[in-house]
Swiss-Prot record:
Protein's UniProt name: C-type lectin domain family 2 member L
Biased composition (Pro residues): 10-28
Region ranges (Disordered): 1-53
Chain segments annotated as transmembrane: 66-86
Record's subcellular location: Membrane
UniProt domain C-type lectin: residue ranges: 104-206
Residue numbers bearing the Phosphoserine modification: S29
Classification via CDD domains: CLECT_NK_receptors_like
Intrachain S-S bonds: C97-C108, C125-C205, C184-C197
GO CC annotation: membrane
Membrane topology designation: Single-pass membrane protein
């Protein structure tokens, strides 16, 4: 009987080949470094960056338009308020007297055309923030007759035995003489005349000029 044979020995696999060492990184050129930097990123983003700039410009333009619109509305409101104030009475006028009034000294005068009684003339002056004219000198009387020849009512009236101006001042007989026996006074070129208050004639209003 033959002895048992030993199985043949297995061949060992060859050891793995050694991996080559990684190559050293190649240095970047200046162009590549610039392309990888922030400016390169902006250039690569392209239209996105330009779109952001356009959006900011549009926003600034809209803001400017809104601001100009608000200024225009404010100016219009100021003009409306000034027009309303001017219609109620002159506050700061370019001329010292209203339209159709005449300036003499520091007063404005209005000479009516239609005849009315003394009280109606007084009421008209009152509604225009004035009074029937108070005459304080002969020169003032002469001025009045440069613009009227119709012997108008003035703001002088008898109260009891004495005459008083409508502004409350007493009448000075040394300045003017008064003829007639009536209560209300009108003027002639050289004197004052009293007559019945219901007599109709034109009148003269006066008030202080605007300053």
């Amino acid at each position: 009987m033959e002895p048992a044979r030993e199985p043949p020995a297995r061949a060992r696999p060859p050891p793995p080949a050694a991996r080559p060492a990684p190559a050293a990184p190649r240095p970047r050129s200046p162009a590549e470094a610039e392309a990888r930097g922030p400016e390169g990123l902006l250039r690569r983003s392209g239209s996105g960056y330009e779109g952001s700039t356009s959006w900011k410009a549009a926003l600034e333009d809209t803001t400017t338009r809104l601001l100009l619109g608000a200024i225009a509305v404010l100016l219009f409101a100021i003009l409306v308020v000034m027009s309303i104030l001017a219609s109620k009475g002159c506050i700061k006028c370019e001329t010292p007297c209203p339209e159709d009034w005449l300036l003499y000294g520091r007063k404005c005068y209005y000479f009516s055309e239609e005849p009315r009684d003394w009280n109606t003339g007084r009421q008209y002056c009152h509604t225009h923030e004035a009074a029937l004219a108070v005459i304080q000198s002969q020169k003032e009387l002469e001025f009045m007759f440069k613009f009227t020849r119709r012997e108008p009512w003035i703001g002088l009236r008898r109260v009891g035995d004495d005459f008083h101006w409508v502004n409350g001042d007493p009448f000075d007989p040394d300045t003017f003489t008064i003829s007639g026996t009536g209560e209300c006074v009108f003027v002639e070129p050289t004197r004052l005349v009293s007559t019945e208050c219901l007599t109709t004639r034109p009148w003269v209003c006066s008030k202080m000029a605007y300053t």
